[in-house]
Amino acid sequence: MSSSIRGLYAIADTHLLPRQDLGNAVALALQGGASLIQYRDKSQEITRRYKEAESLQRICHQYQAPLIINDDALLAAEIGAEGVHLGQDDSSITSARKILGAKAIIGISCYNDLARAIAAEQAGADYVAFGRLFPSITKPEPIWASLALLREARKNLNLPIVAIGGITPENALQVIEAGASAVAVIGGLFKSRDIRAAAAAYRQHFPSWNLPKPRLF
């Protein structure tokens, strides 16, 4: 499944998006060329989170795109999502793999730590994420990753690399050229007035990869 980690990785954060617009926003991102979606909700509202994730899973299936759940392997398993993304304080790769199975996508936040990424690959991660790369309102943490780190990671890792933090259509190409397989975007996509056009602007940097297409029913 790691082969699907490429192109525009759209992170639908409910802290940023009005909940009534969540499904429509994700559909527009997929229409514009997003390759996969992450559902990110840090609340403890179990029922609402289940309903939202289940709805996004149906939308993602329509566009044949994987859905990744942030920091909740159990929710991912309950709705049949393709995988989970884990941060520094989340559950382990081993426990997530036991819950989701061998075919699930498991991604790991590595911030600016190459050693963490190497350990994640050895533990069975399907992709690693570095960032933030540039100033970002939605990723204000004082942790910086550099393009040099991406280049070094590309030399040392044999799995997809996701870059995140302040990535725009204008600076995305240098991130890709440094070694990123995918660019993860939150505000640059979902705070745009035209989400579909914004997604297409990112997607143009990955011309050899086809746009997701709706299934025919």
From Swiss-Prot:
Binding site for Mg(2+): D71, D90
Binding-site positions, 4-amino-2-methyl-5-(diphosphooxymethyl)pyrimidine: Q38, Y39, R40, D41, K42, N70, S109, K139
Cystine pairs: none
Cofactors, names only: Mg(2+)
InterPro entries: Aldolase_TIM, ThiamineP_synth_sf, ThiamineP_synth_TenI, TMP_synthase
Cofactor binding note of this UniProt entry: Binds 1 Mg(2+) ion per subunit.
Pathway noted in the entry: Cofactor biosynthesis; thiamine diphosphate biosynthesis; thiamine phosphate from 4-amino-2-methyl-5-diphosphomethylpyrimidine and 4-methyl-5-(2-phosphoethyl)-thiazole: step 1/1
CDD domains given in the database record: TMP_TenI
Keyword Transferase: yes
GO biological process terms held by the UniProt record: thiamine biosynthetic process; thiamine diphosphate biosynthetic process
Binding positions for 2-[(2R,5Z)-2-carboxy-4-methylthiazol-5(2H)-ylidene]ethyl phosphate per the UniProt entry: S136, I137, T138, G166
UniProt KW Signal keyword: no
Catalyzed reactions: 2-[(2R,5Z)-2-carboxy-4-methylthiazol-5(2H)-ylidene]ethyl phosphate + 4-amino-2-methyl-5-(diphosphooxymethyl)pyrimidine + 2 H(+) = thiamine phosphate + CO2 + diphosphate; 2-(2-carboxy-4-methylthiazol-5-yl)ethyl phosphate + 4-amino-2-methyl-5-(diphosphooxymethyl)pyrimidine + 2 H(+) = thiamine phosphate + CO2 + diphosphate; 4-methyl-5-(2-phosphooxyethyl)-thiazole + 4-amino-2-methyl-5-(diphosphooxymethyl)pyrimidine + H(+) = thiamine phosphate + diphosphate
Gene3D superfamilies documented for this protein: Aldolase class I
Superkingdom to which the source organism belongs: Bacteria
HAMAP family: TMP_synthase
Function summary: Condenses 4-methyl-5-(beta-hydroxyethyl)thiazole monophosphate (THZ-P) and 2-methyl-4-amino-5-hydroxymethyl pyrimidine pyrophosphate (HMP-PP) to form thiamine monophosphate (TMP).
Sequence similarity: Belongs to the thiamine-phosphate synthase family.
Name of protein: Thiamine-phosphate synthase
Lineage, highest ranks first: Bacteria, Pseudomonadati, Pseudomonadota, Gammaproteobacteria, Chromatiales
Gene transcribed to yield this protein: thiE
